[in-house]
Regions:
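Acidic, metal/ion-coordinating pockets
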Residues: 2-19, 23, 29-351, 396-403, ...
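Feature captures C-terminal
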Residues: 41-49, 59, 72, 79, ...
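Short, solvent-exposed loop/turn motifs
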Residues: 201-203, 385, 508, 530
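Alpha-helical structural context
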Residues: 281-282, 383, 407, 411
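Extended, charge- and Ser/Thr-rich helical segments
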Residues: 342-346, 365-366, 380
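Acidic, Ser/Thr/Pro-rich beta/coil linker or hinge segments at domain junctions
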Residues: 350-357, 373, 379-380
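Acidic, glycine-rich low-complexity/disordered segments
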Residues: 363-374
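Glycine-rich phosphate/diphosphate-binding loops and the adjacent beta-loop-alpha structural elements
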Residues: 375-393
């Protein structure tokens, strides 16, 4: 779909104005609204609240489509926009509707089977297709603006553009640029007027910034179409413009964590988690709604190096588990509004019931998806679970690798690389995945592979595979010989997520956790013999990893032999359907194990 920037920006300007006007109309709770302004010794003051969500990932209801029951975790969190809507309604009633804004920091349309269904099964892009459930819910909640997340691009630009059309609020991305013109491909900002009791409006600018890693993670969807420069440089460009346009308050909605780190190393010159750097380097920002990192930060202050101003950051927990509140207090001074004080906190969505309006609005869509994921596609001879997958070779991960290797072998049949052995990588995306004995449903398989990754075949050498395995082994915490091994504390060294620990099928190897990172992988063998450095292999690998996700060595620069446009999840579902019966005895094997001084840990 062509990127008609002018048409979109005209639409966004109209939409943004409509949002701002709606926020200015007197609503129920007008008495509370009037109380938000006041005078003390002749000084005019005004207070307002900006509410924020992030990383909703397709969660409307407090429901887990993979387990087919209400969501629950060890902390008894709840999820979904229906819960958040109840919190939003309470804040609007308390503060006064016209004294609030509601924004989001991205990753909205990917992550659940609900969002998948309306991207792929009953797609919103079809002629006369449905309105995306996330658009319906967010429109009903009167969102004022939302930044783009990296996962917005997972289904391709046409799906994103259709979602954008269906939203009654602007999608913001000041650093999502048209690759040819280098002009914004989305609205960079939105401007909102809040009417005060004094007749002097407060102008609030929301600047949206997305993640530079999109260029790596969704290379197939964006290469040659869009480019994604760093957050710091784009904020430095736009914040002065917003101030010159009369913005009294500038809020950044950033789909970027605050740690200053990048999972992709030096593959890009831009920082992945740059929200803290933006606050530190760019003057004129009052608050930053942080996203992407899936961490909870109720309130965090960063000092701007140029002005000494304290900038408040807040990140609400993912999936609608928390709602951020930025509470602003302004004072009228020297002919304009000045921020006198701003603080942040989060509200827990498990303290309220779901908003019945949202439940009624989307109950039909929910039931369609529940019926879809419960379709039986085959049988399984023995239960498989991922509970021990981070530290043991288990059949459920072997299943992923078996299907991937089988798919690549078939794809390369008759080609010059058909005779090469095929290795495959897989990671544990969920420690709660389970494929039961007996009937297997779509949700059983989908729960094992929760990301929209596609499959590629790359050409790798033995030496490169050794380096790949060594990098993956950084995932484990060094544990001295004789020390007690606690599986709960053994993994995720230096914050490495489970999805960045790959196991490789087709090779046998050991990981010595007593050794320091970088020298752990030993006894690497292929077909019983020591792995030769010059041996050549076809490597079945997901597109996230193949494009540099996780910064694994060699794979991103390796030769591409084949790629598939369909998700690995769908490939797995189709494989189970075609086979009809799954038996772990046919593919399960202990290819790798953890050791200390040659002695197995488990």
């Amino acid at each position: 779909m062509p990127l008609n920037r002018r048409k979109f920006l005209e639409k966004s300007a109209v939409t943004g104005a409509g949002v701002a006007l709606a926020g200015a109309v007197t609503a129920p709770g007008a008495q509370a609204a009037e109380a938000r302004g006041g005078t003390k010794r002749g000084v005019k003051r005004y207070a307002f609240t900006v509410m924020g969500t992030t990383d909703l990932h397709g969660n409307v209801f407090n429901w887990d489509y993979f387990t087919d029951k209400e969501f629950d975790d060890k902390d008894h969190n709840d999820i979904g926009l229906a819960k958040i809507s109840t919190l939003v309604n309470r804040i609007r009633e308390e503060k006064g509707r016209r004294n609030t804004l509601l924004i989001d920091a991205g990753d909205t349309i990917q992550g659940t089977q609900l969002s998948y269904y309306y991207a792929k099964v009953d797609p919103i892009t079809a002629e006369g297709g449905p309105v995306h459930p996330m658009a319906q819910a967010m429109n009903a909640m009167d969102y004022d603006a939302a930044a783009l997340g990296n996962h917005e691009f997972n289904y391709g630009i046409p799906v994103l553009r259709k979602f954008e059309q269906q939203c009654r609020f602007p999608l913001l991305g000041a650093n999502a640029l048209d690759a040819k013109t280098l002009r914004p491909a989305f609205a960079p900002y939105s401007m909102h007027r809040l009417r005060t009791p004094f007749g002097r409006d407060v102008k609030v600018a929301v600047l949206g910034l997305t993640n530079p890693g999109i260029a790596i993670w969704d290379k197939a969807n964006v290469q040659g179409k869009m480019t994604f420069p760093g957050l710091e440089e784009q904020a430095a460009k736009w914040v002065p413009k917003l101030r010159s346009m009369g913005a009294d308050v500038v809020i950044v909605s950033a789909h970027s964590g605050s740690s200053g780190t990048s999972s992709y190393g030096d593959q890009l010159p831009y920082i992945e988690n740059a929200a803290g750097l933006v606050a530190e380097q760019v003057p004129g920002i009052d608050a930053i709604l942080v996203g992407h990192a899936h961490t909870e930060i109720p309130e965090y202050f960063v000092t701007n190096k140029k002005t000494g101003q304290q900038v408040v950051l807040s990140e609400p927990l993912k999936w609608g588990q928390r709602l951020t509140l930025f509470d602003f207090e302004l004072v009228w001074a020297k002919g304009c509004w000045k921020v006198e004080k701003v603080g942040a906190k989060v509200l827990n969505s498990n303290t309220v019931e779901e908003d019945r309006k949202i439940v009624r609005l989307l109950s039909d869509e929910h039931e369609k998806v529940v019926a879809y994921v419960n379709q039986v596609i085959g049988t399984n001879a023995a239960e498989m679970t991922s509970a021990e997958a981070p530290y043991k070779d288990v059949p459920i991960i072997d299943l992923i690798n078996h299907i991937q290797a089988d798919t690549v072998k078939q794809a390369l049949a008759g080609t010059e690389h058909a005779s090469l052995p095929v290795l495959s990588q897989a990671a544990c995306f969920s420690r709660s995945a389970r494929i039961p004995a007996g009937e297997v449903t779509i949700r059983d398989v989908a729960g094992l592979y929760v990301f929209e990754n596609t499959l590629e075949a790359r050409l790798m050498t033995g030496a490169q595979m050794k380096a790949y395995l060594e990098f993956s082994a950084n995932y484990f915490v060094q544990t001295a010989p004789g020390a007690q091994v606690d599986p709960a504390k053994l993994t995720n060294a230096n914050g490495t997520p489970d999805y960045n620990y790959d196991v490789v099928s087709g090779l046998a190897y050991e990981i010595d956790i007593a050794e320091p990172a970088g020298s752990r992988v030993t006894n690497v063998r292929f077909e019983g013999q020591p792995l030769a450095d010059d041996a050549k292999f076809v490597f079945a690998v997901n597109n996230y990893r193949a494009n540099g996700g996780g910064n694994f060595p060699h794979v991103a620069a390796s030769q591409l032999l084949w790629s598939n446009s369909d998700e690995i999840r769908n490939t797995m579902i189709a494989w189970v359907k075609a086979k009809g019966a799954v038996d772990p005895a046919e593919f399960a094997a202990v290819d790798w194990k953890l050791t200390r001084n040659g002695t197995p840990v488990f």
